[in-house]
C-alpha cells in the first residue's frame, strides 16, 4: 500500500495522476494485480512561472506550498521545484502534525534520440498518535448503551468508565507544566533526543519518518516504433516511533 504522507507535495507538482484498476496491459515496468498508479511530473510540460498556495482546515490545519517552474530553456533543459510546509493540531486530541515535503524535477533533451530526467522527493514528518482502542463508553455512554449486548456495568457509577471523555479523547498524551524540560526520544538517521513538539504536552505515542526517493530516467528513441526506457533509482528512509517500554499497570 501507499502511505500518502511520504509523497506529500508531489501532487502539487504533478501534471496528472493516472489510475488503472485491476490487472491489464500497461507500459510500466512493474504492473500490479490490484492496479497501477502512474504519477506524471514532467518539468518540460510546465510553463515558466511559480505560485504560492495556502490551505486551511479543521484542527488548526495549515499547509503552505511554494512552487516554481523554469519552463523549457533553449529547447533542452527544464527545472521544477516544490516545497511544502504542513502543521496542525489534529482532529483528535494530541494528534498534531509537523511536516515538510520537497520535490525537485529536471528534464534534459540531449538530442532527438536521448532524453534524461532526474527526480528527488521526500517528506520528513512527525505526528502525535492515538493508538490504543478503548471501551466505547469511554467516548460515549449513550452510544455504548444503544448497542445490543453491551454490558451496562462497564460504565455504572464508581466503575472505570463512570465519566465519558468524548470522541476527541486520546489516552496517548497528557498536559504537562511547561517548566518540565524532559526531551522526546527521536530516531532519524541515528538515535537521539529532541525537544518536545509542544512544551505544554507530552506524547506517549509519536511517529517520525522520512523516506526520500531519487530516480534517474533515460529515454532512447531507437526508431519510430521502438523506445528503450531505463530507470535507476534509490529509495532510503529512516524513522520510527515512541511508546511505552516494558509493562504498564494501574
What are these regions (language model features)?
Residues 19-20, 48-51, 86-89, 99, ...:
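Extracytoplasmic loops and strand-loop junctions of Gram-negative outer membrane beta-barrel proteins
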Residues 29, 57-60, 94-98, 198, ...:
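Short sequence motifs at beta-strands and strand-loop junctions characteristic
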Residues 23-27, 90:
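Short beta-strands and strand-coil junctions in structured, solvent-facing domains, enriched
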Residues 157-210:
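A conserved mid-domain beta-alpha-beta active-site/ligand-binding segment of alpha/beta enzyme cores
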Residues 198-243:
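Outer-membrane beta-barrel transmembrane strands
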Residues 17-18, 37-39, 230:
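Non-catalytic regulatory/gating segments with a bias toward low-complexity or hydrophobic composition
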Residues 49, 56-87, 92-131, 139-176, ...:
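Transmembrane beta-barrel wall of Gram-negative outer-membrane proteins
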